[in-house]
Every structure is written in C-alpha cells, then in structure tokens.
Amino acid sequence: MPYTGRENYPYYQEELASPSALWSDLYALTMAQALWEDGRHNAQATFHGFIRTAPYDGQYLLTAGQNIVLEWMDKNWKFDEADIYTLAKKTITGPDGKEHKLFKPEFLEMLKNSQLDLTIDAMPEGELAFPAEPIFRVNGPLWQGLMVEAAILNTVNSQSNFATYASHLKTAAGGAPVLEFGLRRAQAVGGLSSTRGAFVGGADISSNVWAERCYDIPTKGTMAHAFIMCYEDELTAFKAWAKGMPYNGIFLVDTYDTLHGVENAINVCKENGLHLSGIRLDSGDLSYLSKEARKLLDAAGFGEAKITASNDLDRATINALKQDGAKIDYWTVGTALVTAKEQPGLGGVYKIGAVFDEKITAKEVDAMRDAVREGKKSPDEIRQHARELMKLSGDAIKMSYPGELDVVRYLKSGENGQLYFDGGTILSNWQEDPIKYKD
C-alpha cells in the first residue's frame, strides 16, 4: 500500500521494518504452541486494531505506520536460524524445580517452515480514524494473527501519536510551516519514528538528515550558537556564514543581543549583496522580539525575510503567541513533538472479532469475501460460518465489537449537506455504496 497522503512520498527503504517475526510479545508464541498442540492454530480468524479514545483532548486520530507494518510483513516476517535458536534455549521451571524447554522442537520446526498467510486491510496512512473504528483488519490463521499484534500496535500507536500531534501543531500554527527539529531529544536511536510520524501528520520540514536519506523527507538547517561563539564577535561570524553559505541566508540572532543580532544580519547581507532569507529567534520574549525584528527587517527592505521561532515550543505556546499577534512565520518544534510530550502514549488496541471452524479452509473464506466484494453476497453470509467474539468488561470502554467489522464512511457535500459514499478512505468489504444493499 503506497502512502498517498503526501505527494512524492516514497515507498520504503524501510529502516523501521527490519525486525524478524520475533517482533512480538512472548505470549503470542506460548499461545501459538498451545493452539498448535490442540490442532486449532490454523483456524481462520479476524482481528481489528483501533483506538478507544482520541488523543490530545481531540476527536480524531491521524493514522500512520500502516505502511511500515505492511512492508515488514511483506519482506521480513520469517523465523531465521537465530530466531529459532533464541526460542529453543528458553526454559521454564516446573513444579518439580527442574528446568523444562518452553517450546517443543516440533513446534519450532513448524515456525521455521512457516510463511505468512495473513490478509491485511488497512486505512491509508494520513487518514482520519475515530474511536472504535478499525484502522487495521487482519484475516488469516489464528496463530499468525496473534503473532503480529505487538508489531502492529508498537508501530501504529507511536506513528499515529506523532502524526496526530503534528496535525494539532499545524492547526495551532494556522497552516504556517511547522518544522520538526527534535532529533537530539528523540527517544529512539536515529529519530526516524518521530520524524516520519510528524511528516505524515503535516510537519513540513525536519532537521534529521538520516530521515531524508531513508524517506526523502525535506530537511533544512542553518547555524547553532556554537558557530557564532567560536568567532571573536557576532558580526565576524555572520560575515563568515555569508561567505560560506551565500544562498542559505538565515541567521540565528539571539546569541548575545537579539535585536542587535538582527541589525548585524541586515548589515552583512546589505554589504555583500545577499538575499536575507530570514532570522531565527531561540530565546527571550518571542512575541515582543518577533514584532521588533519585523519592524527592523521591513525598514531595511527585507520585507520577504521570514522569522522562525524555536525554544521549547508546543501547542499551548504557539496558540499563546498567535493570540498575542507575534510576527512569526515558521514554527520550530522539537522536544514536545518527538517525545509526544502532551500524551506520550496512545492506547490503541488489537482485538479478535471472529473465528471460523477449523474445517473451513482459508481458500473457502477468501472465496466468501471475494463474493462480498463483488456484490454477489452480503457480509451476513460470512457471519453464518464464523463464531463472532466479544470481550466483556465491567468497564464499558474495554468491551469490543464482535464480528468482521467494516468502516463505511459518508461525507457531506454542498450547501444542502448531501451525503455521499467515500469509497477511497474506508476499511470495507464493499467496493460500492452498501446502502443500495441494505434491504
């Protein structure tokens, strides 16, 4: 499934999809052996991945990570010799105090020879999802559906969390460019997960060059305070920058005195006939300084120069600065975005919805689903062959919906608010508007 939410986004050289089939919690394997021993491991089953509540006090989730999961399943889901060795050496202490092998050799042989036989339906990345709507639907052998749970949740929870917060930042910025400059604060080596999720969610630019290599995410960067401080004074540093980077005329102006730094940037560009692309403010009263800097830039004839703000920005500070009339064109967000500081965890879950009789083969189930997609059968006919499953709980939000679930979405169009079927952004067995089959 290619990512369609952003133009020219590449199908992956996926650095994040490199683990083997052991990208899983151990209990998936212990359940798999118990099912295998009972002869039920290949029963056809259906699972759904979804959220229970929307993050950030909002109403939606901006989904991301689906392509990573699909790439991993397509290219790397297999048990190699190192995987089998890891499992073969696991032991458990029995009631007799002796160590026993956790996994049987015959079961490990089954794993070694297995190929992934799951059918995955998913919303496209960048699509909005709402609580209880399946983002993923997984059909196939019961044991394999259990095996991929952790990888799906690990990926889609984190990616969607970053993407959703980035979308909220973009809204707070009023559509102005949002720059993800948080690599040094990211909580994973390489920072790929947060940078990628932020880009899917609407961040325009990153500082992470590794992410550009892997995903072609555009990067930008100028100077740090260290560059300025290693020269005798700010003006000398700016002259050196202008000489070495004549087409990258963005100056960090707050190392010593911010407004004097703006004047130095103006003078250097005027003296050298350079285009002053912009300045960056990284400390102090960003609202006041941006307004004063704007006056200086406009008076000097650099009305097109952009003002970029940084310094631990988040959704609240951006909103406050916007309300105060700050003259900021670009918003640079680091820590708050790459750590999902407002809500570090997303509680997406993965639940079983149906299981078929072991005598019904995958080929037979696929034929039934194909008939539904072609409009020859209703989904009700599939339900006749499956045992629909529902998790019960005293906590209503933890109850799950039974059966094979679709997401059928209708959008309002025009002044009259006429509803129309949106077939391009759904997770459904239907290729056409299902309302026509409702009778």
Where are these regions (language model features)?
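Short beta-strand/loop segments at the ligand-binding rim of alpha/beta enzyme cores
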Residues: N113-Q115, G175, L296-S310, K327-I328
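Glycine-rich phosphate-binding active-site loops on the catalytic face of alpha/beta enzymes
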Residues: K327-G345
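Glycine- and Gly-Pro-enriched alpha-helical subdomains that act as flexible
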Residues: P218-I307
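Ordered alpha/beta subdomains of enzyme catalytic regions
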Residues: M1-M245, L259, H275, Y350-D439
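Structured core elements
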Residues: H48-F50, T119, F136-R137, E180, ...
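Catalytic cores of alpha/beta
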Residues: H260, N264-V268, L313-K327
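Glycine-rich beta-to-alpha transition loops that act as phosphate-gripper elements at the mouths
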Residues: M123, L183-R184, I307-R315, G334-A336
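Short, charged, surface-exposed secondary-structure boundary motifs
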Residues: Y231, Y288-K291, T317, T339-G347
